[in-house]
């Protein structure tokens, strides 16, 4: 077992063979040569659910953050076991779990909720990374963050959709800078629904909204001209364009 890859494969096989025998599992996991990373790698593969439960509840590895991340991330873990592991995870593992489509919705949603709860305690660099790779709901929340670097990273999150930005632009706490930041990203700058939401948003500076309003289709111009929910200047310009 001197080859690292072979050692990890052998550990996974040994865990499978011991899955139904708690005494054998206990002896196996008491081996001091097994590292947290060895076990993390083994647990990420397909294993009987009993293995994850035993590791977390009855072994010395049950409080190790690295190992708990693998337990929560493994589709082989029972939902109850994965949920119990989540509070001990690093934010990176929580983000990984939250976007893993093969995991049960209850697990992904709990991981997402824990991320949202922990945002205020995270370092700026970690927030920037999370903004780029995190789940939609987390990225949407971080679009309201005061630091422009966090918002810029969010706008490059591939999981965001047009509707997320449209909802953001209608939010009462939307930063005034967000419209110009959105338009700097090609994906959003070429999205008609997003440009329309920018025009409608009270947070958008007039020079930006007035530049975009001429691109609106006739139906949207009529709606803008008649709406009481958009800035008065936007309505007035829409009426002028319509003649």
Residue ranges and their predicted role:
Residues 1-243:
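Alpha-helical scaffold segments
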